[in-house]
Amino acid sequence: MRTKIKSLRGTTPEVRALIGHDITLKGWVRTVRNQKTFTFIEINDGSTLSNFQIIATPDIAGYDQLINQLSTGVSVSAIGTIVESPGKEQNLEMQATAITIIGKCDPEVYLLQKKRHTFEFLRSIAHLRPRTNTIGAVTRVRNALAFATHQFFQKRGFLYIHTPIITGSDCEGAGKMFQVTTLDQNNPARTPEGRVDYTQDFFGKPTYLTVSGQLNGEIYACALSDVYTFGPTFRAENSNTSRHLAEFWMIEPEMAFADLNDNMDCAEDYLKYILKYVLDNCQEDMEFFNKHVATDLISRLEHVINTSFERASYTYAVRILEKADKKFEYPVKWGLDLQSEHERFLAEEFFGKPVILTDYPKDIKAFYMRTNEDNKTVAAMDVLVPKVGEIIGGSQREERLSVLESKLKEFNLPAEEYWWYLELRKFGSVPHSGFGAGFERLVQFTTGMENIRDVIPFPRHPGKADF
């Protein structure tokens, strides 16, 4: 039975109890150091940031041949006795009695040499980059954030639902969607008027990859009260930035009988919960990021966890920005959407902590957001955090049928495509709210990584769909 390196870390009684016992380790060689009478071999199995040291001596069967074949990237199986290590770098090490090479790795052509590689280069070898310290640590933190997400909502009685990837509606009304079709691209079926005849397509209508599971989530919230989705979403935006992906994951809770204040409370509690979970359960990886990526990372996250989020209206935020003694690249004016530089100024410099902005102009927000009494703003909210800006966006949903019908017209959206969404307002309509959190943005914020393409296993962006 294989023992994972993670279980050999630390000085707990459970770890100390392994001293003197024979175990089997399997992993990939990181370092080989030949001495006169023995060889140090460090392997890593991905369960933890740390490598584990194995000591091989000439009395191991096939020692000379083995040592000649060992190099970075070789996969091995090692059997031996766990002993206390005299070295400062580790508490325990293995005195090997047998080492077997599982898979060879030619050092002449292996792309991951023992040197610092740029993240841009690592993206070009995404099939190998999980073997690096940074991407391995990102992946473990990403896993912890996903687990904490489910734990947070499950503890609060939310039901996890699966919403469709293929959809016939545009949740955001932005039109930047990937189309799904089985029609012949060179010679698609056409109507007598010469238009593409989507009645001949697989689904009998135009269909797309979803931009959000929200509308479907609302259906279940209006029957089961509290639900959440956690799945992939797609945006066909030609954005080549460090903050945008064409394929990313979204966490989207929907709560019946909840207003905007309930929504803000949930978003704040959620963000604090997942950050605390990671700091408590990924200490080694987080210390790595704090040392090598952002030296103020842990203190920044602790500040978010221990601080009550400021709450302010969009209108108040615009006044702050207009009076700010700072030159912005993008103009500030009531009715315009805030840019990342504005959001970061508010969170980092003015408030000095996370802030939730509310009540945005209705013309810059989605059709489904509840119109406020002033008929100029909607019950929307964005959570802004230092170093990132917006990290969560949500709203109270429009539950009034007549208002929703009017808004579909205002946004030039065909009511017949949203007939089911409108019917929710006909039969037992209730106030309800929800938000969306881009999972990769959360990973980026938690790890301090500069580029969002380095916090998802296989990034999809304009011009790139490799691996």
UniProtKB/Swiss-Prot annotation:
Gene Ontology terms: cellular component: cytoplasm
InterPro entries tied to this protein: Aa-tRNA-synt_II, aa-tRNA-synth_II, aa-tRNA-synth_II/BPL/LPL, Asn-tRNA-ligase, Asp/Asn-tRNA-synth_IIb, NA-bd_OB-fold, NA-bd_OB_tRNA
Chief site of localization: cytoplasm
Transmembrane segments: none
Record's subcellular location: Cytoplasm
Pfam family, one: tRNA_anti-codon
UniProt cross-references to SUPFAM superfamilies, sorted A to Z: Class II aaRS and biotin synthetases, Nucleic acid-binding proteins
Family: Belongs to the class-II aminoacyl-tRNA synthetase family.
Family matches, as PANTHER family: ASPARAGINE--TRNA LIGASE, MITOCHONDRIAL-RELATED, ASPARTYL/LYSYL-TRNA SYNTHETASE
Name the UniProt record assigns to this protein: Asparagine--tRNA ligase
Species whose genome carries this gene: Protochlamydia amoebophila (strain UWE25)
Phylogenetic classification of the source organism: Bacteria, Pseudomonadati, Chlamydiota, Chlamydiia, Parachlamydiales
Gene name of this polypeptide: asnS
